[in-house]
Amino acid sequence: RHAPYTDIPDLVMDYLHYLDVVKLRSPRTINGYYLDLRGFFRYMMMVWNLAQPDTPPEEIDLTHITKRQISTVTKRDIINYLDYARSNDNGAKARARKLSALRGFFGYLCHQINELSENPTDNINLGSPKKSLPKYLSASESIRLLKNIQSDFYERDYCIIVFFLNCGMRLAELITINLGDFKDDTIKITGKGNKERLVYLNTACQAALEHY
């Protein structure tokens, strides 16, 4: 279960509970929504002149925000907040995530508990952030990396890097590998969404694993 958040408006707490119990969102996802919604309402407290000018954002009390105040949030407030986030060095992906959290929250107020008749995030569409191409090490760079491993656990770290270089796995996938996932010259990898795939272990991987 997610943490018992107590420093946010009641409606936001209700929404996080809904995400947990009804939508079965992961604790990590819920915590992300919590942080983004908390940041938005700290901003709104400043817009509403309900926070002292010299109060640091992290010290602004949100627990007294009412349903009526939340119902006054407008499309302009949302757009201004996204601009405020950009001015505070939030990149395109971070702003898109914040908008997604707000869209979900206000959608919940409109369609699940009927507190609002209109969603202020409707028709706000951020441009898609540019996707950077993945960067790969050349063969010579890979060899140089392996030759320069300095560790008290050399065999382990060498094996890890060989697997990264040859199997295309993520760190989160690597740390979930168990002995039972190895079979002959293959390894079962569990990726995002618990999707499993079999990856062939080439001779370099097999040698590094055997040495480890």
Give residue ranges: language-model regions.
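Conserved catalytic core of the tyrosine transesterase superfamily
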Residues: R1-Y212
